[in-house]
Amino acid sequence: MIITEIIGNIHEQPELRTHHAETITLVDDALTKRIQRLVSDHGSELGLRLPSGHPPLRDGDVLHSDGENSILIAVAPTDVLMIRPGTLRDMAFVAHSLGNRHLPAQFDGDVMIVRYDNTVVDFLEHYGVRYERRSTVMPTPFRHSEHTH
């Protein structure tokens, strides 16, 4: 079966829930790939061929449904560092320093979130910056931004 569109998302459209659901668990990097071969937890094989410019896959996306059975995307937890600098100056310093490494980052309120990296931990500990290591399902995948020097 070739999937060319997302039917909806069970978190936003509960009516898409069915009695039987197969799950395809994807890691962060796979969420942005619009063409890939997938296998569900029940062994069903699918081809994904989404149009160019399609947004990343999300937890709860419905790839197939016949009313009784469905195939859903589940996002695997990502190992991340939740960075909580104490001052605005510290946040600017951390953001600038990690930005120079071209690390993809996300922000949630006053928390900077990056994928776990032992060199980042060494940096944070060296400068006394508060952080917490956590495994969590990210709402959007980490992405590298385009840049030139």
From Swiss-Prot:
GO terms for biological process: protein folding; protein-containing complex assembly; urea metabolic process. SMART domains: UreE_N (SM00988). It comes from the Bacteria. It is found in: Cytoplasm. InterPro entries: UreE, UreE_C_dom, UreE_N, UreE_N_sf. GO terms for cellular component: cytoplasm. Pfam families: UreE_C, UreE_N. Involved in urease metallocenter assembly. Binds nickel. Probably functions as a nickel donor during metallocenter assembly. Belongs to the UreE family. This is Urease accessory protein UreE. The lineage of its organism: Bacteria, Bacillati, Actinomycetota, Actinomycetes, Mycobacteriales.
